[in-house]
């Protein structure tokens, strides 16, 4: 896709990928409602294919490509859930899926890529190394690059998540989503504002990876230098395409501490009895810190994924 998607294009994307993804449930918790003084609705993308919302964007990007575009397969660079999502999408399309991963990527995410038949190339844990390795694979195989977030087709697919939220809950006042590269937040903002112009959309990110916050404050996309956070899915800087939308349409960016992320993650596990990864806990962490006025409001929260290394949980002392 060459440009920013419309609501009708996001709806068409949902039709194309519907057979290959779950319409994930929306759960609530009376306990958390009482604690935060609001009606909270959790969109459980931790129950999605590959355990994360990334299945939506990767599947649409691969299935919407022409035969000529994917004749040599597809390639991406990712340390996280997009890697597994693209490997799975390539398998559905019947083409090779080349995945460049840093050698320090979480073990659980490496294993997920291999489970879906992805062809992994390891590299040093820098963006330059990842991009160079992906470019080499492109040159050698003719594979099409599917960027993890700075890709309009990926953004379009990610926007299908909030379609389901607002179809089921049209009277929401606010939606909270974590932000890393910005694909989910961008698709969410475009679709939500088109479906319900008065709704508020906030992006939440770790204070140790706060480029989105700084970018919105200055009006210029800021670099993500040396991110430090347990939310490994949010260590990437906001993409150019995402920022071109978000600086115009997003209601704000909230930063949260590592301690609040751990509290929110553990609270979700213990109270709701569901597994989420640190990145998925970041929106609830904003409520833990009381950084948003949600009193009496109906708030949608996107739980983005549930892929965790059970041997290295963030509340364990040796993490």
PLM-predicted stretches and their roles:
Residues 1-319:
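PLP-dependent amino-acid enzyme catalytic core
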């Amino acid at each position: 896709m060459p440009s920013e998607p419309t609501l009708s294009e996001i709806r068409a994307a949902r039709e194309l990928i519907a057979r290959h993804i779950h319409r994930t449930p929306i759960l609530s918790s009376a306990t958390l409602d009482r604690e935060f003084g609001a009606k909270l609705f959790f969109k459980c993308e931790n129950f999605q294919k590959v355990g994360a919302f990334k299945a939506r964007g990767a599947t649409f990007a691969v299935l919407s490509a022409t035969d000529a575009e994917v004749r040599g397969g597809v390639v991406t660079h990712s340390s996280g859930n997009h890697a597994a999502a693209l490997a799975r999408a390539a398998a559905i399309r019947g083409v090779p899926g080349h995945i460049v991963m840093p050698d320090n990527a979480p073990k659980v995410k490496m294993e997920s890529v291999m489970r879906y038949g992805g062809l992994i190339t390891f590299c040093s844990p820098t963006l330059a190394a990842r991009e160079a390795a992906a470019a080499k694979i492109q040159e050698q195989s003719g594979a099409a690059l599917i960027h993890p977030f700075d890709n309009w087709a990926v953004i379009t697919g990610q926007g299908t998540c909030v379609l389901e939220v607002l179809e089921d809950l049209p009277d929401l006042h606010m939606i909270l989503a974590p932000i890393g590269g910005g694909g989910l937040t961008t698709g969410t903002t475009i679709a939500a504002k088109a479906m319900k112009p008065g709704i508020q959309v906030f992006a939440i990110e770790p204070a140790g990876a706060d480029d989105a916050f700084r970018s919105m404050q200055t009006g210029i996309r800021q670099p993500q230098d040396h991110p430090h956070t347990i939310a490994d899915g949010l260590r990437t800087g906001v993409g150019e395409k995402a920022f071109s939308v978000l600086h115009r349409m997003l209601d704000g960016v909230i930063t949260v501490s590592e301690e609040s992320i751990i509290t929110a993650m553990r609270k979700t596990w213990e109270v709701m009895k569901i597994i989420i990864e640190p990145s998925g806990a970041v929106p609830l962490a904003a409520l833990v810190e009381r950084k948003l006025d949600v009193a009496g409001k109906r708030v949608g929260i996107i739980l983005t994924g549930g892929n965790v290394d059970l041997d290295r949980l963030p509340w364990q002392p040796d993490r």
